[in-house]
Structures are given as structure tokens and as C-alpha cells.
């Protein structure tokens, strides 16, 4: 559970000075928000996770191991319900704030989202892209593509997909 991130620079995964680069889940996106297990409050981890979505949508969350599936199913099947739409919009806005901060700091050539964040992007792509564009310098001056992960497994797939893309595009080129 949680929000992960990865940065690929020149085809290599950047891990930072102590291996903890891009702990994006602990960016504050709501200073008065939910308490986080890190000791902070309003971290991306707890403000944009399936539990936050389900409770904001006024749904009773089931077992923790199925929260992601419950949230995704709810987005796909009941998005027109006012509580579901309001919850999705709140999470999209918080996710957009976090992504805008990353865009300002890193100026990435793209952002790839998996899990619930992919589902939120697919539910309302215009809203998420607008929040990132409105809140980031690079978003206003040029478009940073925000893309859904195309792989089905959610743990670090966005970063892995990006890191392996050159190999998938031209396998022989990596041998030279």
C-alpha cells in the first residue's frame, strides 16, 4: 500500500544518495488532511489511496487486500453517483497537486500512473491534466503527457515500463 515513484535519468534508475529517491507518497497535498504512518499529515499516500477514495465516497471499505479493486470497480461502475464523482474529483485534485510539484522540480518528459491513479486519470483525464497544468510552470508552458500504465501489475510498473522501453523498442541496440 502506498504511492511510489521512480526517476529514470539517461536510461538509469536514479535512487538518490541513500536509495530513497522519489518517496513521492510523502509529499504533503492537504496540510489538514489524514494522519500518515510517516508521522506527517495529508501525505499523497493517505490522501489519494483507495481507502481515502472509498470513505470520501461514503462507501464502507471492505478488507484491506481488496481496497484497490473496490475503488477501481466503484470508479468504473458508479462514476455518475454524486458521492463517487465528488470523491474522485477531490482525489484527482490532490493527486494533481503532487504531480505538479514533481513537474516543477523534475521537468519530466512524461508521467505514467498505475493502480487507482490510473483509474482516476481514465475517469477524468481533463481534470487531472488541468490541475497539473494550472499548478506547474512546465505544465503551463508545455504539455507533460500523463499516461496510464499499460501493464496490469501495479507495483512500480510505470517506472519499470519507462526504464525498459528502450530495450523493448530496440533490443539489439542495448548490446552495442
In which residue ranges do the predicted regions lie?
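Phosphate-binding/catalytic loop of phosphoryl-transfer enzymes
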Residues: 1-52, 159, 167-175
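ATP-binding/phosphotransfer module of carbohydrate and carboxylate kinases, centering on a glycine-rich
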Residues: 32, 44-176
Amino acid at each position: 500500500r502506498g504511492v511510489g515513484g521512480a526517476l529514470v535519468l539517461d536510461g538509469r534508475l536514479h535512487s538518490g544518495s541513500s536509495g530513497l529517491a522519489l518517496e513521492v507518497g510523502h509529499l504533503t497535498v492537504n496540510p489538514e488532511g489524514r494522519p500518515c504512518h510517516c508521522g506527517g499529515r495529508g501525505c499523497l499516500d493517505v490522501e489519494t489511496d483507495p481507502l481515502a477514495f472509498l470513505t470520501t465516497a461514503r462507501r464502507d471499505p471492505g478488507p484491506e487486500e481488496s481496497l484497490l479493486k473496490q475503488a477501481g470497480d466503484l470508479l468504473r461502475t458508479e462514476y455518475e453517483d454524486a458521492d463517487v464523482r465528488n470523491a474522485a474529483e477531490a482525489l484527482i485534485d490532490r493527486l494533481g497537486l503532487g504531480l505538479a510539484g514533481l513537474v516543477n522540480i523534475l521537468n519530466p518528459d512524461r508521467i505514467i500512473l498505475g493502480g487507482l491513479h490510473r483509474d482516476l486519470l481514465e475517469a477524468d483525464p481533463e481534470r487531472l491534466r488541468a490541475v497539473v497544468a494550472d499548478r506547474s510552470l512546465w505544465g503551463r508552458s508545455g504539455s507533460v503527457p500523463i499516461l496510464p500504465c499499460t501493464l496490469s501489475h501495479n507495483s512500480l510498473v510505470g517506472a519499470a515500463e519507462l526504464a525498459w522501453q528502450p530495450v523493448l523498442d530496440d533490443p539489439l541496440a542495448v548490446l552495442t
